[in-house]
Amino acid sequence: MKKRYFNCRELVVIGVFAASVKVVTMIIALAGGGLNPVSLILKNLVFTTLMVVLLYKVRKTGALTLFSLVSALISFVLLGGGITSIPSSLLSAMLTELCVILTGGCKRSYAPVVGAFFYDLISKTASLRVSYIMVRETPGVIFMVVGIVAIGYIGSLLGLGTGVYCARELKNAGIINR
């Protein structure tokens, strides 16, 4: 029998984390009342924390790309997100996987943090580029969008630390094996 790259448990973990991230960030956005700074920071903090924990749990090349694909499909099908976000999300994930490989691979202890950092950075940069293309008639609007994304990125940077802390606690509890 042929051994598959991802086993069933890892695929379930990726799917559960993708769905959890979408549900929790949507609840935070709805409870926060829109684009206020606290909900932006908290939403990105939770997203990055869960992504770091996922990358510690499933340490294989392609896990982030698969997570990104499942997350984008959930967003498209269930939440009515635009289909135009799927290519940029996949491209961001693939570039991040390349960055992780260039910095030593997935088995390194710092690989999940590097992956989450680069994924957030690349995906937010890609989102800003798409936003600029959409509002090129009034380029002054992009400065407001940059401010909103920068506030959210603060939460992403904080999420790196909380993700490492949560992964360490889950490792001590025996939930994360490596």
Model-predicted regions and their roles:
Residues 11-16, 41-45, 61-69, 86-87, ...:
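Hydrophobic alpha-helical transmembrane segments
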Residues 39-98:
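Alpha-helical membrane segments and adjacent membrane-interface helices in multi-pass membrane proteins
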Residues 81-131:
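Membrane-proximal helix-loop-helix units in multi-pass membrane proteins
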Residues 109-178:
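Membrane-embedded alpha-helical hairpins and interfacial helices in multi-pass inner-membrane proteins
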